[in-house]
């Protein structure tokens, strides 16, 4: 039985078009208040993005649900997340698949996320301190790649690390950003534009 605040959010997400019950169940199962600073705990189940420090944010629940739904996951999906951040999106993915790989360029955020995931007994996640633009070649190929910050263009490395039939979901752009879904079909990449979005930029190269 979920709390009224959680149920209200789930109802709102359904109204906004989220249909995958597995995704909604994962959102209900992950305590979002554990991934935000104490000052924002009262807003944890509001359908808004919140700051997590280091110039980064925890995404709006609608956007987490939308991007996760677009990945078309199965329990066997090999998943790469670019931008571990607070670890919230990571936790949602960990409830849906057998194993998640996640890359974060800010060491402090990576450590905090690992601690949160461990405290929630989510041990099916591998995290790495690295440049998200480069993906995680040693663990490739992936059935699904999700990027939680916006590059100005789609990183080539991420496209090449998609397996046949794999899906990449990411925001793209600088001043004007759009959520894109890229599907690999043989040697081709089919790119669909989903909706206008606003994310922090995906910083290239420099680790922190």
UniProtKB/Swiss-Prot annotation:
Gene3D superfamilies: Vaccinia Virus protein VP39. One of its GO terms (cellular component) is cytoplasm. Pfam families: PCMT. Its EC number is 2.1.1.77. Keywords: Cytoplasm, Methyltransferase, S-adenosyl-L-methionine, Transferase. The active site is at 59. It is found in: Cytoplasm. It catalyses: [protein]-L-isoaspartate + S-adenosyl-L-methionine = [protein]-L-isoaspartate alpha-methyl ester + S-adenosyl-L-homocysteine. Belongs to the methyltransferase superfamily. L-isoaspartyl/D-aspartyl protein methyltransferase family. NCBIfam families: pimt, PRK00312.1. This is Protein-L-isoaspartate O-methyltransferase.
